[in-house]
Amino acid sequence: MGENEGIDKSFLDTVKFDDRGLIPAIVQDHETGKVLMMAWMNRESLEMTLERKKACYWSRSRNKLWLKGESSGNMQEVFDILIDCDGDTLILKVSQIGGACHVGYHSCFYRKVNEDGSMQICDTLMFNPEEVYGKKH
């Protein structure tokens, strides 16, 4: 994603959005390949991501655009976008500032399932969500 490259409309036209106009985006650390999160994108959020080089998603719960880190400061600088062979899933390779997960961990995939079915924390807590977002009511 060079500085002088404009949005390639042919890429946007190959993206296969679902019947809700969404496509899943798997987000990875661009240096380590660690999976940080999965989020949904619509055409507008994908265009915004391409233009700004900052990850923008579509919040299904809030029904609006969601610039990652807008309220927490935990932004994602986008280095690469990959599209799968079917055109219906994306990978965003990012540099994550702070934690990707809204509960404070570096990755949303911070719990490992053990053989006995129990779970254990397997990631680093990056921030206290109550300090960032306030207490839930």
From Swiss-Prot:
Its cofactor is Mg(2+); Zn(2+). Gene3D superfamilies: Phosphoribosyl-AMP cyclohydrolase (3.10.20.810). Coiled coil: none annotated. Mg(2+) binds at D84, D86, D88. It is an enzyme of class 3 (hydrolase). One of its GO terms (molecular function) is magnesium ion binding. The keyword Zinc applies. Its EC number is 3.5.4.19. It comes from the Bacteria. It catalyses: 1-(5-phospho-beta-D-ribosyl)-5'-AMP + H2O = 1-(5-phospho-beta-D-ribosyl)-5-[(5-phospho-beta-D-ribosylamino)methylideneamino]imidazole-4-carboxamide. PANTHER family: HISTIDINE BIOSYNTHESIS BIFUNCTIONAL PROTEIN, HISTIDINE BIOSYNTHESIS BIFUNCTIONAL PROTEIN HIS7. Homodimer. Belongs to the PRA-CH family. This is Phosphoribosyl-AMP cyclohydrolase. The gene is hisI.
